[in-house]
Amino acid sequence: MLCEIECRALNAAHTMLIQDFEPRDALTYLEGEKIFTEDHSDLISNMPTRLERIANFLRAYRRQASELAPLIDFFEYNNQNHLKDFLDEYLWFATHQPDKLRPVVLVPKFSRQMLDRKLLLGNVPKQMNCFSREFHVDRVIEKLDEMCDLESFFLFLHGRSGSGKSVIASQALSKSDQLIGINYDSVVWLKDSGTTPKATFDLFTDLLLMLKRARVVSDTDDSHNMPDFINRVLSRSEDDLLNFPSVEHVTSVVLKRMIANALIDRPNTLFVLDDVVQEDTIRWAQELRLRCLITTRDVEISNAASPECEFIEVTPLESYECFELLESYGMPVPAIERDEDILHKTIDLTSGNPAALMMIFKSCEPKTFEKMAQLNSKLETRGLSAIECITPYCYKSLSSSLQRCVEVLSDEDRSALAFAVIMPPGIDIPVKIWSCVIPVDICSNEEDQLDDEVADRLKRLSKRGALLSGKRSPVLTYKIDHVIHLFLKHVVDVQTIANGISILEQRLHELGNNNTPTPERHMPSKFRRTSAGDMFPKVEDSVIRPEDYSKFMQIHRTFYDSLKKFTSQ
């Protein structure tokens, strides 16, 4: 079997082979070199078209030959020096100067038209081109470029629901002329979202199908005759689907073996696994030594990976980015101060979430700030589920998406998240105050151990869906954004909120009296679907001093008065 570098060299030469190579000419020569048997030669020679002969020739050569030298010698013998020179040049640069392989050898033979074709065949979704987060897109391109020579890797693109992870990944693949076709021979994009072992099995069954389909399409590729190319792709791809073996009763071991065999023909493929939820998906990809770009809400699944891992966090939109996004979709520029206030209110309520902003824009008919103010009011009184519409985002409301995040949390993390609704949004709150209300189970009366346990619980929530955000300066603090608080306020049981307020009052009073709070608490929490209530005003964004911890509820009196009014309705 050829080594990976030589497999890549054959893939890179594929277009040139289609233009000027007849496998029948090489069979007798390679039989003499003990590469092929008579059976191989008969099978390849009897193929009805040259494209099929090339496809089967390359497939057999990858498996039967131990090096490219015999084929290169044939090209020299057959006076096809352009093929010999290309393969020699590729192997020399790949071995001695890999950093110059792409600009010197590959780039001159690649075109934008081929990139678009590879993106289409790789199932890469077409995304918006009216707005782009250039910083994040360029970081993805840079990381994929840096890691392309690794045998296997994971690049995790992680962030909150609706933050635009899939859009950024798609835009990165579409923007760069270097990634697909130069750094990577091809791409396969698959949507995951599965939460069961069967879902993981189905995902990799689809991956096998995409690899087989990609091989058929590549084997019939002829960029000089586009109509014939399309017809061949359609007919061969349909045949490939019809002849695809059933994997209904195949074990996971057999499926992995089938994928590994298919990867011989696609040795340098980038796999984009979108919306990964389970660590089993990471384990499968690791066993198969895939090169993966992963989009996920839960960055903790990266713990299942041992190869090279890199991380890019997709943060909420900055205020200026929110303006640009809405303007790109046709929202008018604020003309007066009142319009600016309404727009800022929308940005605050959505916490710069692109999906939420898009839903507000799509629901804003007519496109006036008066209508936007009405939508803001609906959000405040009825929660995120009040605005529901069809957008490019896969959920009709952000509430449904966040609810899915909650469902995959452990019972302990879900209970901690429920009591996060007691905290005012947009405020960096020290762990000591969080410890007053977050339920944990410890066997010690040590106050520091309680704080450490609570900090660990809050850290998990910040990693599993960016439901909270942490900061270490000047002390360790955690913050709940407005959009998450707005979601929790209308799904957490009212009695749980009322109990949480009461517990917080009691613990803060004990802090003021220098009493040690009880470290073990098991407070029941329940989520509900709908309710109504008043939203809170914007509060100060400064870290409270330790001597003022007991005054926390007094400092944020307006918020707690509003929350108490909400629970009494």
From Swiss-Prot:
Query: Which keywords fit this entry according to its UniProt record?
Result: Apoptosis, ATP-binding, Cytoplasm, Magnesium, Metal-binding, Mitochondrion, Nucleotide-binding
Compartmental location: Mitochondrion; Cytoplasm, Perinuclear region
What is the protein named? Cell death protein 4
Is the Zinc keyword given for this protein? no
The job of this chain, per UniProt, is described as: Plays a major role in programmed cell death (PCD, apoptosis). egl-1 binds to and directly inhibits the activity of ced-9, releasing the cell death activator ced-4 from a ced-9/ced-4 containing protein complex and allowing ced-4 to induce caspase ced-3 autoproteolytic cleavage and activation. Also forms a holoenzyme with processed ced-3 enhancing ced-3 activity. Component of the egl-1, ced-9, ced-4 and ced-3 apoptotic signaling cascade required for the initiation of programmed cell death in cells fated to die during embryonic and postembryonic development.
InterPro entries, sorted: CARD, Ced-4, CED4_WHD, DEATH-like_dom_sf, NB-ARC, P-loop_NTPase, WH-like_DNA-bd_sf, WH_DNA-bd_sf
Entry binding sites for ATP: 131, 162-167, 171
The GO molecular function terms of this record are: ADP binding; ATP binding; BH1 domain binding; BH3 domain binding; caspase binding; cysteine-type endopeptidase activator activity; cysteine-type endopeptidase activator activity involved in apoptotic process; identical protein binding
All residue ranges annotated as the CARD domain in the record: 1-91
Q: Which residues belong to any copy of the NB-ARC domain?
A: 116-442
Judging by the UniProt lineage, the source's domain of life is Eukaryota
One annotated GO biological process: embryo development ending in birth or egg hatching
The record's listing under Gene3D superfamilies reads: Ced-4 linker helical domain-like, Death Domain, Fas, P-loop containing nucleotide triphosphate hydrolases, Winged helix-like DNA-binding domain superfamily/Winged helix DNA-binding domain
What gene is behind this protein?
Answer: ced-4
Query: Where, by residue number, does Mg(2+) bind?
Result: 166
Q: Please give the SMART domains that the UniProt record associates with this protein.
A: CARD
| Subunit structure, as described in the record | Associates as an asymmetric homodimer with ced-9. Upon release from ced-9, forms an octamer, known as the apoptosome, and interacts with ced-3; the interaction results in ced-3 autoproteolytic cleavage and activation. The octamer (a tetramer of an asymmetric dimer) also interacts with two processed ced-3 to form a stable holoenzyme. Interacts with sex-determining protein fem-1. May form a complex composed of ced-3, ced-4 and mac-1 or of ced-9, ced-4 and mac-1. Within the complex, interacts with ced-4.
Give me the Gene Ontology terms describing cellular component: caspase complex; cytosol; membrane; mitochondrion; nucleus; perinuclear region of cytoplasm
Chief localization: mitochondrion
